Amino acid sequence: MAKVWSKRFDNALDPFIEKFNASIGFDRKLILEDLDCSIAHAKMLGKTQVLTSSESSQIINGLELIKVEYLEGKFSPGLPSEDIHYSIEEKLISLIGETGKKLHTGRSRNDQVGTDIRLWLRKEIDKIEILITDLQKSFFNIAKSNIYTLIPGYTHMQRAQPLSLAHHLLAYIEMLQRDRERFKEVRARVNISPLGAAALAGTKIKIDRQFTASELGFEKIYKNSIDAVSDRDFCIEFVSASALSMSHLSKISEEIILWVTDEFSFAKLTDKCATGSSLMPQKKNPDVPELIRGKTGRVYGHLQALLTMVKGVPLSYNKDFQEDKEPIFDTAETISSCMKAMTILINEGIEFNIKNLSDSVENDFSNATDLADYLVGKDVPFRTAYQVVGEIVKYCLKRKMLFKNLKIGEFKKFHPEFDEDVFSDLKPHNVVKSRNSEGGTGFVQVEKELNHWQKKLLL
């Protein structure tokens, strides 16, 4: 099949180079967006009388028919068409004849593909935002039932201070909220129309860029035709936002993987979200969080690929930009599938071992800060209190004891301000309850946080 640009050349493309150059194998994913873009363009050409009303209607009807045939499985774009744009144009010409050749008046593939990608990304971002919200709701539902369930908090993967499990889960909701906000910000910059910028310099054809932008739901148009076709920063922003969101999913995954080990035993996997071993019959493997953790690197790789793609590319459009599509397509699919999988895992795949969680905070030194705070409440300088408690920890470790095993006389050997009420302060429930600074893990603060998210998530 002859290329639309073939009259300029004396010889045909080398067959391998033809396949190497083609993008139809992956940009056919943009078929519906390309059809919508072309329909809006054809309407505009009719409105501005570049085409007659009859020609505009004929083209629009032809494009609508192609859409129907595609949705019914009767039209499948592919080689020898070079890309989705030519594939549709060739199909249109075969349906309506010479009038179909007028569709491309006043535009270039450069602004056309930029428009298609933005339309596609806009839809994907909207889907991802919904998926993030669904995951937030899943965490919320578990959190509201576990305000008084305690869990060890860690720094440097060492026991630090006890926490409300609800507070721990609400931390994930906060992270996911920032992810949602980033996607909203990306969407705002995606939602700008390049259509009408043509190849790079605009066009002498009488067009109405504001009309096509409005038809396609864009907020505004690019003000500079060169810029409109010269950058893929919006693609990079999308993958960057996705990479950050995946980093949060990976963090959550890592914690779940640890929690379900025999060593931690803070939770267990249900049969719905675990697999077995081909050799070891006792195994129950956390494949879902492991896969999410692994797929995070995949999105990081796409981000690096796009950053490298645009590095040092001069104005304006360059063929390098053909390499933008597979990274964003795969990124969208990856983050969407991981969000769905994590939501199912949280809803159906994990059960917390409340007894083990409770036992774990009863048998460690994570209340050491509270012992120091007790002395601070007795007007002892914090640094002095800190050093005193350090000595007590060392004393207990040598004797394989915990604070709760000491007698008041032993406490007083380290500082005279210790009294019987110290034992109440050291109980894990009271330790957590006392952390009532704004945003803290104290039960009153956690309830406030839950009320905030109940309204925010419209629950």
Swiss-Prot record:
Q: What class of enzyme is it?
A: lyase
Quote the SUPFAM superfamilies the UniProt record gives.
Answer: L-aspartase-like (SSF48557)
The protein's name: Argininosuccinate lyase
InterPro entries, per this entry? Arg_succ_lyase_C, Argininosuccinate_lyase, Fumarase/histidase_N, Fumarate_lyase_CS, Fumarate_lyase_fam, Fumarate_lyase_N, L-Aspartase-like
Q: Name one GO biological process term.
A: L-arginine biosynthetic process
Q: Which HAMAP family match?
A: Arg_succ_lyase (MF_00006)
The record, for PANTHER family, names: ARGININOSUCCINATE LYASE
Task: Supply the gene name.
Answer: argH
Its Enzyme Commission number(s) read 4.3.2.1
Q: Which GO-annotated molecular functions does the record name?
A: argininosuccinate lyase activity
Signal sequence bounds = none
Q: In which pathway does it act?
A: Amino-acid biosynthesis; L-arginine biosynthesis; L-arginine from L-ornithine and carbamoyl phosphate: step 3/3
What CDD domains would the database entry show?
Argininosuccinate_lyase
Catalytic activity annotation = 2-(N(omega)-L-arginino)succinate = fumarate + L-arginine
What does the similarity note say? Belongs to the lyase 1 family. Argininosuccinate lyase subfamily.
Subcellular location per the Swiss-Prot or TrEMBL entry: Cytoplasm
Give the main localization category: cytoplasm
